[in-house]
């Protein structure tokens, strides 16, 4: 346990940040799973609506350094490729 006030504050701040980051990371994973489910069910309209939200989440995560910006770009690109394959087939 920390004995210095600033260290105690650092611990509190770290807990808050960790909780927020965990929540946002979970939201990203959940959104990706929803899109993949819509793609699997061959529902391009629902998948596209979810994809727009997903890209927004990814951009926000990259902006706040939750994930690297190139990681976000790669995830968007791969998901778009899957979405385009379903849209072309439909």
Curated annotation (Swiss-Prot):
One record GO biological process: translation
Domain of life: Bacteria
GO molecular function, one term: small ribosomal subunit rRNA binding
Annotated region described as Disordered, given as residue ranges: 1-29, 69-90
Keyword line: Ribonucleoprotein, Ribosomal protein, RNA-binding, rRNA-binding
Biased composition (Basic and acidic residues): 1-11
Entry GO CC: cytosol; small ribosomal subunit
A Pfam cross-reference name: Ribosomal_S20p
Entry's family note: Belongs to the bacterial ribosomal protein bS20 family.
Function: Binds directly to 16S ribosomal RNA.
NCBIfam families in UniProt: S20
Name of this chain's protein: Small ribosomal subunit protein bS20
Primary gene name: rpsT
């Amino acid at each position: 346990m920390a004995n210095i006030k600033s260290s105690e504050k650092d611990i509190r701040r770290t807990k808050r940040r960790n909780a927020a980051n965990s929540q946002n990371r979970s939201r990203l994973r959940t959104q990706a799973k929803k899109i993949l489910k819509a793609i699997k069910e061959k529902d391009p309209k629902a998948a596209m609506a979810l994809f727009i939200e997903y890209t927004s989440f990814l951009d926000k995560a990259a902006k706040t350094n939750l994930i690297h910006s190139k990681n976000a770009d790669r995830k968007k690109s791969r998901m778009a490729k899957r979405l385009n394959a379903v849209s072309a087939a439909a």
